[in-house]
Design a protein with these regions (language model features):
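Substrate-binding cleft of secreted/luminal carbohydrate-active enzymes
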Residues: 8-31, 48-132
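Charged helix-capping and loop-helix junction motifs
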Residues: 2-5, 35-39, 82
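Surface-exposed amphipathic alpha-helices with a cationic face
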Residues: 40-49
């Protein structure tokens, strides 16, 4: 037995959900699902005034190849501050109400990966946290 829900209906009516947290684990250069366009789509699907958009972002991809991104597969290796730029862009959306990061251990474990360390510094600055 399969169950489906009508996302457009749920996001158009009050009483179903308070927020939606789509897993936007895509970079800006992802050939299949570019981050900006995908976030814009989710934001535009929300018609009810009380429903908030909280994008889930892929911290774990920093410094790694994304084979599913096709021509954008090396973005997470070559580009800097992707997560910080995604948060900045997300903040421009009318339904934005925060973000989540996946995975905890990639953020808070001491890392030898310079890209991860640079992203953490960028995030701390963006979020006005102590920049030790």
């Amino acid at each position: 037995k399969k169950h489906f829900l009508n996302v457009e209906e749920i996001l158009s009516s009050s009483g179903y959900v308070d927020y939606i947290m789509p897993q936007l684990y895509f970079g800006f250069k992802n050939q299949v699902k570019p981050f900006k366009e995908t976030l814009d789509t989710w934001n535009s699907l929300i018609k009810a005034n009380n429903i908030k958009l909280i994008p889930a972002l892929a911290f774990y991809k920093i410094g790694r190849e994304d084979v599913y991104a096709k021509s954008g597969s090396n973005e997470w290796i070559e580009d800097d501050n992707i997560i910080s730029r995604q948060i900045e862009y997300s903040r421009t959306k009318s339904k934005y109400d925060g973000f989540s990061l996946f995975r905890y251990d990639y953020i808070f474990n001491t890392s030898e990966n310079e890209k991860i360390n640079n992203e953490v510094k960028s995030l701390r600055k963006l979020l006005n946290l102590d920049t030790k």
